[in-house]
């Protein structure tokens, strides 16, 4: 899904919303009973894009939708759901809005707010998962893909206090180092807060 984001934007289409949700994020919403999924989760599916178009010219909107459909077929796209009424739109948006709540209900977590050029979203996501495997933590990732923004929710789950309070800082620094290396920033969409101040040297 991340690979399709840059392609969509580079073809002159500017969705009003372009959201990324990895499969585990959607599973959390379902398993924590925060939303009834308006689609079936396929075993081979790895992630989802929520694409919203806006405008007053119906013909132009249909043309853009068809163009997007054609573009995403290059990326092993599965079933495409078209939400053409308010009820269906709200059902899909509820899944996206419920991810943070579902994560919070499951475990103590740390949310790292990252942003990179859209073309590097795939490398960022792959890097986050590799760092997670190295430091033995699970992450739930989602975000505003159209802006290159990725929320990385790191779950405490089975980590010891030492791993959570000490070792994880090394992992988070590696995530932010990767962001900067990929041409991004550690400030994401929310700026640099108290928690991220210790990593501010990476953004200089």
Question: Each predicted region: which residue ranges?
Answer:
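Noncatalytic alpha-helical scaffold of FAD-dependent oxidoreductases
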Residues: 1-204
């Amino acid at each position: 899904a991340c690979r399709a984001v840059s392609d969509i934007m580079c073809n002159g289409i500017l969705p009003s919303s372009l959201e990324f949700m990895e499969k585990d994020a959607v599973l959390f919403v379902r398993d924590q009973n925060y939303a009834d999924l308006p689609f079936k989760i396929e075993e081979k599916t790895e992630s989802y894009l929520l694409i919203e178009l806006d405008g007053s010219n119906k013909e132009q909107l249909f043309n853009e939708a068809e163009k997007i459909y054609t573009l995403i077929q290059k990326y092993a796209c599965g079933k495409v759901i078209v939400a053409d009424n308010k009820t269906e739109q709200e059902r899909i948006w509820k899944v996206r809005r419920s991810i943070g709540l579902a994560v919070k209900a499951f475990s103590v977590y740390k949310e790292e707010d990252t942003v990179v050029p859209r073309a590097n979203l795939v490398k960022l996501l792959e890097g986050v998962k590799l760092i997670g495997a190295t430091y033995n933590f699970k992450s739930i990732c989602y975000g505003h893909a159209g802006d290159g923004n990725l929320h990385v929710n790191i779950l405490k789950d089975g980590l010891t206090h030492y791993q959570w309070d000490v070792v994880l800082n090394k992992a988070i620094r590696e995530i932010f180092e990767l962001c900067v290396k990929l041409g991004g920033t550690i400030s994401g969409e929310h700026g640099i807060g108290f928690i991220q101040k210790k990593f501010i040297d990476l953004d200089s």
